[in-house]
């Protein structure tokens, strides 16, 4: 038990020292740097060209959906690699667990596919237009 605590203590000291170095470097640079703001420094740098318009560019939300799906399956590979290296020692139970894991991810992919998140060009819906609101025989509309 004493070795376990010393192992966690080492990790904790390493974490604290890492945070101290990052925060200390940031604060030292902040205190030592000169502060002379001007419009040239505050403008967006575009390879020597004068900035035209805003630096903010609107992206289609589909980029983010595809990126999230990619990250999910990329992390899946990270989880499957250690399993694949020790598959023979783990046995059939580990195989069933991995098949369930992959099955859940495949269900998520099928859901995204059926929902249309993977279709880059979505068809525009055909909404029927009514010429005017139906009127009752009495002449009053919905009354």
UniProtKB/Swiss-Prot annotation:
EC category: translocase
Signal peptide: none
InterPro entries referenced in this protein's UniProt entry, alphabetically: NAD(P)H_OxRDtase_bac/plastid, NADH_UbQ/plastoQ_OxRdtase_su3, NDAH_ubi_oxred_su3_sf
EC number: 7.1.1.-
Keywords of this entry: Cell inner membrane, Cell membrane, Membrane, NAD, Quinone, Translocase, Transmembrane, Transmembrane helix, Transport
SS bond partners: none
Major subcellular location class: membrane
GO cellular component: NADH dehydrogenase complex; plasma membrane
Membrane-traversing stretches: 7-27, 63-83, 90-110
Keyword field contains DNA damage: no
Keyword Glycosyltransferase attributed: no
Bilayer disposition of the protein: Multi-pass membrane protein
Locations listed in the record: Cell inner membrane
Catalytic activity: a quinone + NADH + 5 H(+)(in) = a quinol + NAD(+) + 4 H(+)(out)
GO MF entry, a single one: NADH:ubiquinone reductase (non-electrogenic) activity
Role: NDH-1 shuttles electrons from NADH, via FMN and iron-sulfur (Fe-S) centers, to quinones in the respiratory chain. The immediate electron acceptor for the enzyme in this species is believed to be a menaquinone. Couples the redox reaction to proton translocation (for every two electrons transferred, four hydrogen ions are translocated across the cytoplasmic membrane), and thus conserves the redox energy in a proton gradient.
Annotated family: Belongs to the complex I subunit 3 family.
Complex formation: NDH-1 is composed of 14 different subunits. Subunits NuoA, H, J, K, L, M, N constitute the membrane sector of the complex.
The protein's name: NADH-quinone oxidoreductase subunit A
Organism: Chlorobaculum tepidum (strain ATCC 49652 / DSM 12025 / NBRC 103806 / TLS)
């Amino acid at each position: 038990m004493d070795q376990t605590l010393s192992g966690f203590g080492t990790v904790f000291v390493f974490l604290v020292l890492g945070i101290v170095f990052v925060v200390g470097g940031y604060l030292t640079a902040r205190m030592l740097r000169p502060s002379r703001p001007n419009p040239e420094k505050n403008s967006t740098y575009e390879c020597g060209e004068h900035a035209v318009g805003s630096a903010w560019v609107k992206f289609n939300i589909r980029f983010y959906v595809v990126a999230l799906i990619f990250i999910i399956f990329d992390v899946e590979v990270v989880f499957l690699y250690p399993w694949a290296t020790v598959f023979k020692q783990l046995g059939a139970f580990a195989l069933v667990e991995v098949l369930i894991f992959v099955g859940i991810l495949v269900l998520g992919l099928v859901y995204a596919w059926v929902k249309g998140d993977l279709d880059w060009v979505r068809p525009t819906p055909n909404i029927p237009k009514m010429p005017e609101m139906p009127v009752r025989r009495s002449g009053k509309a919905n009354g």
